[in-house]
DNA sequence: GTCGTACTTCGATATTCGTCGAACATCGAA
DNA sequence: TTCGATGTTCGACGAATATCGAAGTACGAC
């Protein structure tokens, strides 16, 4: 289907385990990190370049959306996603921040523009 | 088997996804919260009172241990577990703290002493 | 209207995970 | 040494999950 307007949960109704489960998957964590590392606050669905099928990507984005982690916006037949980091900070203070700050093996080698070199290098 | 000395991972080798996955399960999150809410820093294995089989509990404790979240110590035939919160703070600054601080539906109604009333009430 | 693009949903599959009871291993006590 | 207590491991099971390709749906362009 075309990107029909998706339901976005009220963050007050999102449970911590849901958020943790959403983040506890390498591909999804990578997506979150990529969105956080961008200069623009939005990323075009089409430009999310990962070695997975598009249907799988759609699946992961849905899980992140249901966990309150990202916002998707429709523009014609296209879709743009962005982190709900401000809201998440209100609901789970410090969580997203420390997840993003942490250094581990899940990197952000996602081409097609938007990756900040300065962050990637630190 | 009796509580043979278990392997505890070096926290530098523990990945964020491993920790998140360990925490992203209601029973395990409950165990972590219970350990954090205790006055004594240790809890006897035997006194962890949850509505699950003992083999299941053993399984969950192993996952938490492998994620670097808890430490288990053997004393004769008994076992005592405690949070590795200080070390986790060094590896993933702020993570455990904000997970414990967050308010959601996973409570800590675990009897047999050790639950702090002041925390439970806040 | 017809076609193509852009996502989403469906159905199928393989893997992982939570759970249990039973069997096992280790220690202390009798 | 025999017994009981204490955890752990094993084997099995159903449920959940990550993945894909194919089919479907909505929109813009022509």
Please place each PLM-identified region on the residue numbering.
Chain A
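Amphipathic alpha-helical dimerization/coiled-coil segments
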Residues: 1-15, 33-38, 84-122
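Short leucine-rich amphipathic alpha-helices used at interfaces
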Residues: 4-13, 28, 65-66, 74
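N-terminal helix-turn-helix DNA-binding core of bacterial DNA-binding proteins
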Residues: 18-53, 75-87
């Amino acid at each position: 289907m075309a990107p029909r307007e998706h339901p976005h949960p009220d963050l007050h109704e999102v449970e911590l385990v849901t958020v943790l489960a959403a983040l506890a998957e390498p591909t999804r964590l990578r997506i979150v990190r990529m969105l956080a590392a961008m200069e623009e606050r939005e990323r075009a669905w089409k430009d999310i370049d990962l070695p997975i099928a598009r249907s799988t990507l759609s699946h992961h984005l849905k899980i992140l959306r249901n966990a309150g982690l990202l916002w998707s916006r429709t523009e014609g037949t296209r879709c743009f996603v962005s982190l709900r980091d401000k809201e998440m900070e209100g609901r789970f203070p410090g969580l997203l921040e420390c997840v993003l700050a942490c250094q581990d093996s899940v990197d952000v080698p996602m081409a097609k523009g938007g990756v900040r070199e300065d962050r990637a290098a630190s």
